[in-house]
Amino acid sequence: MYPAHLLVLLAVCVSLLGATAIPPLPLNLVQFSNLIQCVNKGSRASYHYADYGCYCGAGGSGTPVDELDRCCKIHDDCYGEAEKMGCYPKWTLYTYDCSTEEPNCSTKTGCQGFVCACDLEAAKCFARSPYNNKNYNIDTSKRCK
C-alpha cells in the first residue's frame, strides 16, 4: 500500500472516531427544524431558536422574555401534554405538507397528529413573532426567574 493511501485511511478512521462522540439529535427535532424552515420560508435559520430567551432550547423556567419566547413555552407545554397522553414527542415522527401556501399536518390523529400540531403551531408562532437579537444566548440564571 502506498503511504498516501495509508494517510487517507488514517484520516477517515480518525474522523469517524470523532463523529461517534457526537450524540444524534432526536429525529423529531430535525423534523421540527425542517417544519420551521417550511413555515418561515427560510427567512431565519432554525438554529436561531435553539438558544433564545428562557424557553427556546433545552429546558425552560421563569417568565418568557417576549412573544417569541412565549411561543417556545407554549410548545414546551404542548409537548408536556403529549407526554401525559403517553407520547414521546421528541421521537415521534409525522408527515406534513409543505408544498402549499399554508403548511399542514398530513397526520391528523394519535401521537403523530398531536405532536405535528404542536410543532406546526410553534413554527407559525415563530414566523409571526419578532426576533430580538438581545434575547439570543441570554444568561438564563439571571433573566429567567
Swiss-Prot record:
Its EC number is 3.1.1.4. It catalyses: a 1,2-diacyl-sn-glycero-3-phosphocholine + H2O = a 1-acyl-sn-glycero-3-phosphocholine + a fatty acid + H(+). Binds 1 Ca(2+) ion. Residues 22-27 form a propeptide. Residues 1-21 form the signal peptide. Pfam families: Phospholip_A2_1. Its cofactor is Ca(2+). InterPro entries: PLipase_A2, PLipase_A2_Asp_AS, PLipase_A2_dom, PLipase_A2_dom_sf, PLipase_A2_His_AS. It comes from the Eukaryota. Belongs to the phospholipase A2 family. Group I subfamily. D49 sub-subfamily. This is Acidic phospholipase A2 1.
